[in-house]
């Protein structure tokens, strides 16, 4: 047993220090990033925000909506191959280039991924997604997928430390997904005692990934636009959002009527709700590691994504970053004990 004494930080523990800026307007800020990925050699351009691959967020409808803003969607893995075929038939190139095909690590998952990727050459992202990215099996699976898809962009996770980021990149991942337990409907940290404060995880994992020419996704923990900006400031190349994009018309969640009001069900992908729906219930050897909540129905996602991107643009103007890629270089975080004045309640 050992204890690491260094303090680890989450988004609530810091604020940006403002810096001199020559920008006159938020409209001058360019949020588009261009990446060339290490293993696939693929070039990609877009706004590096990703809707999470949860079945009450990462829907085909969400992908169509967010692609209009240059934003990505990781499609949840519970659609059938026929569902994908119907989607590909109707989707334009811009949408197809902004989606990730999510998969688990079983042989059935591998075959399904091959079937889906064969539907269109314009599907270029594969997201290998398991809760515990420290499994040796994940490394072997990344190698298997890389061998089968040498020209596709592969994301793998989730992990929170630089050593495993390096191992996954060396195994063939272009992008590593970072985050264990920070999500709004995740209870892994409570059920297992395992986790890592998300901002520190991003800072440390970005350093490891960039040293090898890889990229990271900061996955989870964002509760507001300022948190998204902090993730980018900490070095995340992409930021994945679940709860912030849940509850919308395009989210794909179940709508529930309660006391005359409309709500949408939102749950973690290791929750009892998810396992009841997709696995026939919680297996006898495990515990559910997620919660189920009802969110007030929020209408179209377009207003929400505009608000998030507007907040990030504003961050850039405060620190003098004309482009999103400059934000991490312009970032100085200050440690704080407060974030906002809640005398009239929190912002909705």
Curated annotation (Swiss-Prot):
Note whether Manganese occurs among the keywords. no
Could you say which residues bind K(+) here?
181, 183
| Database matches in InterPro entries | Aldolase_TIM (IPR013785), GMP_reductase (IPR050139), GMPR (IPR005993), IMP_DH/GMP_Rdtase_CS (IPR015875), IMP_DH_GMPRt (IPR001093)
Which residues are involved in binding NADP(+)? 108-131, 216-239
Catalyses which reaction?
IMP + NH4(+) + NADP(+) = GMP + NADPH + 2 H(+)
Looking at the record's lineage, which domain of life comes first?
Bacteria
Q: What does this protein do?
A: Catalyzes the irreversible NADPH-dependent deamination of GMP to IMP. It functions in the conversion of nucleobase, nucleoside and nucleotide derivatives of G to A nucleotides, and in maintaining the intracellular balance of A and G nucleotides.
HAMAP family from the entry?
GMP_reduct_type1 (MF_00596)
Alphabetized NCBIfam families for the sequence:
GMP_reduct_1, PRK05096.1
Protein name in UniProt: GMP reductase
Q: Which organism is it from?
A: Vibrio vulnificus (strain YJ016)
Native organism taxonomy: Bacteria, Pseudomonadati, Pseudomonadota, Gammaproteobacteria, Vibrionales
The UniProt gene name for this protein comes to: guaC
